């Protein structure tokens, strides 16, 4: 598995002219995402089957998908700061705290239970366009031209992508 991940990193670099990427390998989408986030910007982390909780439990609860500022605050109020703290909570406690769907999801994620399928290709829900400048732009007229260009690109691209 590690060799495959190394090959993927090499292919990314070759296809992009040397751009690096972090690769995470795990037994689920959750663990692959966590693994890739552990060693940025140019890392490779493999979480072997059976090692999920060892990696997951020390992390802050905010590393889990679905734990934004509001949920994190509610969890902190009941002493939950790490994923291990979350895993120590009962399902009824989490349902009472976060609601049936969200509480059940948090309960599962804290135990590295994630059966979401990996979908290689999916329908785009958004488009993006960005420009990086060598230095900060302070002239509003120059900035306005770039904004106009970006808006035009978006206006022309949306119908072709069938997003709207």
Region annotations inferred by a language model:
Residues 71, 76-158:
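DNA-contacting surface of Y-family translesion DNA polymerases
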Residues 160-164:
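Single conserved hydrophobic/aromatic residue that forms the stacking wall/gate
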Residues 1-105, 118:
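Gly/Gly-Pro- and Ser/Thr-rich, intrinsically disordered tail segments characteristic of DNA damage-repair
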């Amino acid at each position: 598995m590690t060799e495959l991940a190394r090959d993927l990193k090499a292919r990314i670099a070759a296809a992009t002219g040397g751009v690096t990427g972090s690769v995470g390998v795990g037994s689920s989408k959750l663990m692959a995402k966590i693994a890739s986030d552990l060693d940025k910007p140019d890392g490779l982390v493999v979480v072997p089957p059976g090692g999920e909780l060892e990696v997951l439990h020390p992390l802050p609860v905010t590393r889990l998908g679905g734990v934004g500022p509001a949920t994190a605050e509610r969890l902190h109020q009941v002493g939950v700061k790490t994923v291990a703290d979350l895993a120590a909570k009962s399902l009824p406690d989490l349902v009472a705290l976060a609601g049936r769907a969200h509480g059940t999801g948090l309960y599962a994620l804290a135990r590295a239970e994630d059966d979401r399928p990996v979908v290689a290709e999916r329908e785009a829900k958004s488009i993006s366009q960005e420009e990086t400048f060598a230095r900060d732009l302070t002239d509003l007229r120059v900035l306005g031209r770039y904004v106009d260009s970006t808006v035009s690109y978006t206006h022309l691209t949306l119908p072709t992508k069938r997003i709207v």
